[in-house]
Regions:
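Structural beta-sheet core signal
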Residues: 38, 90, 118-119, 212
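Conserved core of the sugar-phosphate nucleotidyltransferase
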Residues: 98-183, 187, 191
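Short N-terminal binding/cap micro-motifs at the start of the first secondary-structure element
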Residues: 1-3, 46
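Cofactor-binding loop segments of dinucleotide-utilizing enzymes, especially the Rossmann-like FAD-
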Residues: 40-41, 93, 121-122, 215
């Protein structure tokens, strides 16, 4: 996203007129959260400034720092003191969902099962190397029903397509038990020095303590240029203030 991210962190790049980070804050609030903790770098003071302005009477937004970019598992560990020993959500701001329905489902699944619950989707096997890949309980991987809950047996970080354990992958929505902090303390850094959250999830899966929801929710991967552009266009099309005009312009543009 250079040169834009020299001036604006990727998390604050606008999706039409709303920063990507705000979508995640709003999603958390819609799911019933009253407190949002943003894990960020000290090199991004604009995120702390944004967090201060984003707090409302319904949701308090604060910041904790990850001094080195040592992976998602490390980022979760940085929030341990703020979270305490309570279950918590992890929402990745480079994945914007069409609404809060998946997050609400994960919360309900956690409350029912008492197990860490994660968002899942199906992809072509050729794409699994871009995601954490999961093996689910027998029969569930062939389920055709939309938004089905599954027991997770195995978690593999970005396997080659030939090594895929299924066509089901992890997307950036998690409801985690505080037990995950114990697992994060036990895992070893990967070859690039990062602590992978998937390694901790794999330990939970081995203890029958991990479940998920296979969802068909609308999802925008704003961590890629094409994903960001798609999000801007599709979300703007849904807006009453600009959608009709944009729709007319697109039809005019592409009907030439």
């Amino acid at each position: 996203f250079l040169p834009a991210t020299r001036a604006t962190p990727k998390e604050l790049l606008p999706i039409y007129d709303t920063p990507a980070l705000q979508f995640v804050i709003d999603e958390a609030a819609q799911a019933g959260c009253t407190r949002v903790v943003i894990v960020t770098s000290r090199a991004k003071p604009s995120i702390e400034n944004y967090a201060s302005a984003a707090s409302t009477d319904k949701v308090a937004v604060s910041v904790v720092y990850q001094d080195s970019p040592l992976g998602l598992g490390h980022a979760v560990t940085c929030a341990h003191q703020a979270v305490g020993n309570e279950p918590f959500l992890v929402l990745l701001p480079d994945e914007i969902m069409g609404d809060a329905s998946l997050t609400k489902q994960l919360i309900a699944l956690y409350e029912k099962s008492g197990k860490s619950s994660i968002g899942l989707k199906r992809v072509a096997v050729a794409e699994v190397s871009n995601y954490g890949n999961v093996k689910v309980a027998s029969g569930a991987s062939d389920a055709s029903s939309t938004d089905s809950s599954v027991a997770i047996l195995q978690v593999v970080e970005k396997p080659k397509p030939a090594d895929a354990v299924s066509d089901i992958v992890i997307i950036g929505r998690y409801v985690l038990s505080p037990k995950v902090f114990e697992k994060l303390e036990q895992i070893k850094p990967s070859s690039n020095g990062e602590l992978q959250l998937t390694d901790a999830l794999a330990m939970l899966a081995s203890e029958n303590a991990l479940v998920g929801v296979v969802s068909e929710i609308t999802r925008y991967d704003t961590g890629t240029p094409m994903g960001l552009l798609r999000a801007v266009i599709e979300i703007a099309l849904e807006r009453k203030d600009i959608g009709p005009q944009l729709n007319s312009w697109l039809k005019e543009k592409f009907n030439k």
